[in-house]
């Protein structure tokens, strides 16, 4: 386990211990087949993301937006950003154009990572109203990108900027300079009673949460962990960090409505959840009992 690792190096350190062992199980956006990658592959892509971000000129503690459903690209982006001491700001995948515009302008975001077509379309529609926004980077390879538009880029092309890890020395220098006071995330409130408020979370706060929960939550390298709640949710975010720290396999569920199907197919040993999910399960079982015939 790597409970004491700084977030900027967490995936590197876990990969050094578990190597080619399976780390992530996932489907591509709208994909049918489950895929997987090892800890070494996870670490390698995170390094590539960090190098690509440096190629774009991402600064220390610069804010980067992530507007997507759960995906492996989401994890690669988070850890790649932390690897160069940048800050990620997660947006809920269902955020409105007004919410996106407010958060991008409030946090002065230059680079916005988006999931699939719906998020891309919303981001494009507010682009001209976001003074700081320079580029949209799209996770889902199925999204149709306009030709000749330098303000949009596929995640595949983004990764090419990091090929060869030519800036890895700078990445490692930033990691040496990293502290627990560095900001890791800014999580915006729902804004139901007014404008959203950005809640600042430091590396040290996440480290303390992982350390405290590790003492009482019995999850380890043998577990298969389902990520069901959105990574935007602080509960799921902290849970994922704990599970990565101990080397557990993460099963990334992209679409919430598919979670029961994902559970049947992947047989997770544990997951974080909220009461509402189990209320739905209970009512579903009750409905089946009431509509089924007598035995």
Where are these regions (language model features)?
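Structural core segment of the AMP-binding/adenylate-forming
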Residues: 10, 56, 83-161
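Conserved pre-ATP/AMP-binding loop-to-beta segment of ANL
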Residues: 19-22, 137-138, 153-156, 163-188, ...
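Conserved AMP-binding/adenylate-forming core of the ANL superfamily
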Residues: 24-79, 96-101, 154-163, 203-204
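Conserved AMP-binding A3 loop
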Residues: 36-40, 184-210
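Conserved structural elements of the adenylate-forming
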Residues: 43-48, 180, 199-220, 228
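A short helix-loop-beta submotif of the ANL/AMP-binding
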Residues: 50, 62-63, 69-89, 93-97, ...
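Conserved AMP-binding/adenylation subdomain of ANL enzymes
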Residues: 207-224, 231-295
